[in-house]
Every structure is written in structure tokens, then in C-alpha cells.
């Protein structure tokens, strides 16, 4: 179960699509994996959204409040329990920057006095 929400695990949507295509070529069912935000859920379903006859999707039935409030729009299963990929641009859902700001922690990483990373502004 590749976790496309965690870049360190599979390196994003492109590599996950390669894994999904490889799995299909070997007769193996590819299943997404995420229990975090709906943003991560949207990213995790992209690699297999267009695969023929794909019917399995891991869905966080009881997301944590923080995970739910990070996005203004959400993906919900229909009456048949199926999840469809949003058709809006990008990942298809809208991020709630106000909610994200509540959890933002300023961080700065320096090596030898040189700033390598600083928390970006969410203006």
C-alpha cells in the first residue's frame, strides 16, 4: 500500500503511478494508503484513478478533526460506497488556509549559520 501522502515513502504521485501500472501489469490490485487529511486522500487516489476495473480504495472512515478541517471540500463515498475523484483543478479539493494556520509551527533549520529551511508564510 503505497502512501503517496508521505513523500519520503514513495516520492509522490508520479512514482506511485508507476507502481500502480506495474502492479496492474503483474495482475496485482493496487490499493492507496492514507489515514490523514482529505488532501492526502486526494493525492493517494490519483495514481490509480484511471485504471481499468479498479474498485478498491482505502478511505479514512473516522478522520481526526484536524484532518477533516484542513480542507474546505471533502471526498465522501456515494450510496454504493464508491469514492470518485474530484474534478476540480489540482488534487480537486480546496485547502482551508485558516485551519492550517492554527497548526503551523515556525521552524528554522540552520547549518553553519546558513538557513536551509524556514517555515513559509501562509498569507
Could you describe each region identified by the protein language model?
Residues 91-123:
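Extended hydrophobic packing segments that form well-structured cores
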Amino acid at each position: 500500500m503505497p502512501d503517496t501522502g508521505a513523500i519520503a515513502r514513495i516520492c509522490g504521485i508520479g512514482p506511485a503511478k508507476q507502481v500502480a501500472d506495474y502492479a496492474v501489469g503483474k495482475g496485482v490490485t493496487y490499493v492507496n494508503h492514507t489515514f490523514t487529511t482529505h488532501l492526502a486522500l486526494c493525492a493517494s487516489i490519483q495514481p490509480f484513478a484511471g485504471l481499468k476495473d479498479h474498485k478498491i480504495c482505502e478511505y479514512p472512515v473516522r478522520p481526526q478533526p484536524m484532518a477533516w478541517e484542513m480542507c474546505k471540500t471533502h471526498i465522501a463515498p456515494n450510496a454504493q460506497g464508491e469514492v470518485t475523484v474530484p474534478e476540480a483543478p489540482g488534487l480537486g479539493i480546496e485547502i482551508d488556509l485558516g485551519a492550517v494556520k492554527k497548526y503551523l509551527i515556525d521552524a528554522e533549520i540552520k547549518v553553519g549559520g546558513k538557513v536551509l529551511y524556514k517555515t513559509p508564510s501562509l498569507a
